[in-house]
């Protein structure tokens, strides 16, 4: 059972790292949009860049969502002894909904900003 919990924890960690990498890639694509004059490019290039940016933003949110669900499951699986430790108490106090709202807000802002920069 402990091995299963460790694998699930590692899975949540990997998803969180992937979310971070995807958000960085989304920021990089925003730089391409702004500094590459994509607004003046052909329609096909604009569509390609917009699709890539939206895909990066949405996939980063999906990875973040998966990581949050994994960490929430870990909190639910804490034994009473684990929950009584300082780390257990800290895990139980995490504002999971805030993290989820922050992620979706960041994703929506990125998508709207990208589309406005491309099609303005």
Describe each model-derived feature in a short phrase:
Residues 24-30, 100-109:
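Core segments of transmembrane alpha-helices
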Residues 110-120:
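Juxtamembrane boundary at the C-terminal end of a transmembrane helix
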């Amino acid at each position: 059972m402990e091995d299963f919990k460790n694998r699930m924890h590692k899975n949540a960690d990997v998803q969180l790292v992937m979310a971070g990498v995807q958000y960085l890639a989304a920021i990089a694509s925003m730089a391409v949009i702004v500094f590459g004059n994509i607004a003046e490019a052909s329609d096909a290039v604009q569509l390609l860049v917009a699709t890539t940016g939206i895909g990066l933003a949405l996939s980063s949110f999906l990875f973040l969502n998966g990581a949050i669900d994994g960490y929430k499951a870990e909190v639910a699986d804490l034994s009473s002894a684990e929950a009584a430790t300082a780390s257990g108490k800290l895990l139980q106090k995490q504002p999971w909904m805030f993290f989820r709202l922050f992620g979706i807000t960041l994703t929506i802002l990125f998508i709207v900003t990208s589309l406005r920069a491309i099609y303005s």
